[in-house]
C-alpha cells in the first residue's frame, strides 16, 4: 500500500518489513512475488536473479510515483530463488545489491537474497507471552548470558561446519543458562551477514546456517 510506504519513510510506521522486500502474494488470480525497494537516488532499478540469468535488462522495476520506491510483481517464482536488485546510478554505473528487507540470504561466500514464504509460520509462544505480561521487568533481577551459537558448541559432523541448528541448540542452551543462574540470553550475530565477522547486511533475515 503506497500510503503505508510513505508513512514508514516519514517515520510514522515501524513495519517496513511488511512493505519492502519480497512477499508472496495472491494477485490477479495467481501466486506472485511482490518486490519493493527504496532507492531514491537511482536512475533505474531492475530485478535480477537465477530466474532471468542475472540480466539487468530483463526485468525492470516500476517507480511508484516520485517516492523513490520501485516495485514489481513477478509470477511463477518459488521459494529459495536467488535475487538481487540492479541499481543504475545517474552516472550509468550498475550496482548489484542484496535486498535489505529479504527474509533469507544465500550462505557465504554467496551474497544474494533468497525468496522465502513466511505466511505459514505459526507462533506457539502464547503461554510465555501471557506469563511475561504478569511480570515487571524493571523490578525483576536480570543476568544476561551473551552467546554466539556458531562458537558456543559444535557437533562432530562435516556438514554445516558442525554448527548446531536453532532447534538443536534451544534445549541445551536453555538448560545450561538455567543451571548457571542466568535470566536472559542475548544471541550474537543472529542477523544475516556475508562473512565470518559479524558485519550485518540484512536485519530481517536470521542466519541461514542455523536454520535446519
Describe these PLM feature segments.
Residues 1-34, 64-146, 151-159, 168, ...:
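The feature marks proteins involved in alpha-glucan
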Residues 37, 85, 147, 177, ...:
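Conserved, mostly hydrophobic/aromatic
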Residues 38-45:
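Short proline/glycine-enriched turn/loop motifs at strand-loop junctions of beta-rich domains
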Residues 45-47, 83:
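Short beta-strand elements bearing conserved aromatic residues within extracellular beta-rich modules
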Residues 57-65:
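Solvent-exposed serine/threonine-rich low-complexity stretches and specific carbohydrate-binding patches
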Residues 143, 159-162, 193-212:
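Aromatic- and acidic-residue-enriched carbohydrate-binding clefts of CAZyme catalytic domains
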Amino acid at each position: 500500500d503506497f500510503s503505508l510506504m510513505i508513512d514508514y519513510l516519514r517515520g510514522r510506521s515501524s513495519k517496513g518489513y511488511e512493505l519492502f522486500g519480497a512477499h508472496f502474494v495472491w494477485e490477479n488470480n495467481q501466486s506472485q512475488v511482490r518486490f519493493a525497494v527504496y532507492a531514491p537516488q537511482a536512475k533505474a532499478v531492475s530485478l535480477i536473479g537465477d530466474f532471468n540469468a542475472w540480466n539487468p535488462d530483463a526485468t525492470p522495476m516500476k517507480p511508484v510515483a516520485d517516492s523513490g520506491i520501485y516495485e514489481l510483481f513477478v509470477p511463477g517464482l518459488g521459494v529459495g530463488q536467488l535475487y538481487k536488485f540492479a541499481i543504475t546510478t545517474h552516472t550509468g554505473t550498475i550496482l548489484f545489491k542484496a535486498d535489505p528487507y529479504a527474509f533469507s540470504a544465500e550462505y557465504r561466500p554467496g551474497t544474494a537474497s533468497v525468496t522465502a514464504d513466511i505466511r505459514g509460520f505459526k507462533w506457539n509462544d502464547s503461554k510465555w507471552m501471557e506469563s511475561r505480561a504478569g511480570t515487571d521487568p524493571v523490578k525483576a533481577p536480570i543476568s544476561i548470558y551473551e552467546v554466539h551459537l556458531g562458537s558456543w558448541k559444535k557437533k562432530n559432523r562435516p556438514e554445516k561446519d558442525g554448527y548446531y541448528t536453532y532447534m538443536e541448540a534451544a534445549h541445551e542452551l536453555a538448560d545450561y543458562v538455567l543451571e548457571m543462574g542466568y535470566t536472559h540470553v542475548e544471541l550474537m550475530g543472529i542477523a544475516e551477514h556475508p562473512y565470518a565477522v559479524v558485519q550485518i547486511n540484512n536485519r530481517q533475515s536470521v542466519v541461514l546456517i542455523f536454520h535446519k
